């Protein structure tokens, strides 16, 4: 059933995770805690926020198996960050400290409006969904993709040079975006197209 909830009793029990994944047509990695810098081999700086080790362990296993099985994966905000870190890339732990700019990355409500521009790469998977060129997106994050994971492709950049969307080109649908289409799809047809593309891939 679409959107059905699953109760995972032990997030480090791989047998239980396999059973759950076997009932899924796709994997959605949502926003939330900061990604533990240990995932990408770094020490946490003071500005790094709260992390959740159990979540990182669980999502690392689910992502690894989803990639192996070529299940559709859609990462949103923390989701794109975790995808990149778990697959071998790195993150900015705190943008104000490590990548200061005038671009608004930590907006205030309402969240269904665009606050900065991105440029979508011509010929990319994302361009096929929403079109290449300039788009306006919402933005609510303080971490971001830094060094791209091996095998991943950057599909969009913000005005200050941050990677805003990635994919794994040789997979069916493994896509991550830094913005929040789930906040804006009722008003923004491009966000709706993105959500629909994931649903269709599943």
Region locations from a protein language model:
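Conserved G/P- and acidic residue-centered "switch" motifs that form tight phosphate/ATP-binding loops
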Residues: 77
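Flexible loop residues that form catalytic
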Residues: 32, 171, 182
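Pocket-forming structural segment of enzyme catalytic cores
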Residues: 50, 87-164, 187, 201
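Acyltransferase
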Residues: 177-202
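Short, small-residue-biased leader/transition segments that mark boundaries at the very start
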Residues: 1-8
């Amino acid at each position: 059933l679409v959107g059905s909830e699953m109760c995972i009793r032990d997030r480090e029990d791989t047998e239980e995770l396999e059973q759950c994944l076997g009932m899924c047509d796709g994997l959605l990695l949502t926003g939330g805690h900061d990604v533990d810098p240990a995932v990408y081999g770094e020490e946490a700086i003071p500005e790094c926020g709260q992390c959740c080790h159990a979540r990182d362990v669980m999502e690392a296993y689910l992502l690894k198996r989803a990639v192996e099985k070529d299940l559709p994966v859609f990462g949103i905000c923390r989701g794109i960050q975790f995808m990149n870190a778990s697959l071998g890339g790195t993150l900015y732990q705190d943008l104000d400290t490590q990548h200061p700019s005038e671009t608004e990355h930590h907006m205030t409500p309402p969240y269904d409006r665009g606050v900065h521009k991105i440029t979508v790469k011509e010929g990319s998977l994302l361009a096929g969904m929403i079109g290449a060129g300039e788009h306006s997106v919402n933005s609510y994050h303080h971490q971001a993709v830094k060094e791209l994971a091996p095998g991943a492709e950057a599909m969009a950049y913000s005005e200050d040079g941050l990677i805003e969307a990635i994919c794994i080109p040789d997979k069916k649908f493994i896509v991550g975006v830094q913005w929040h289409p789930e906040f804006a799809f009722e008003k923004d047809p491009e966000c709706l197209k993105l959500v629909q593309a994931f649903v269709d891939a599943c």
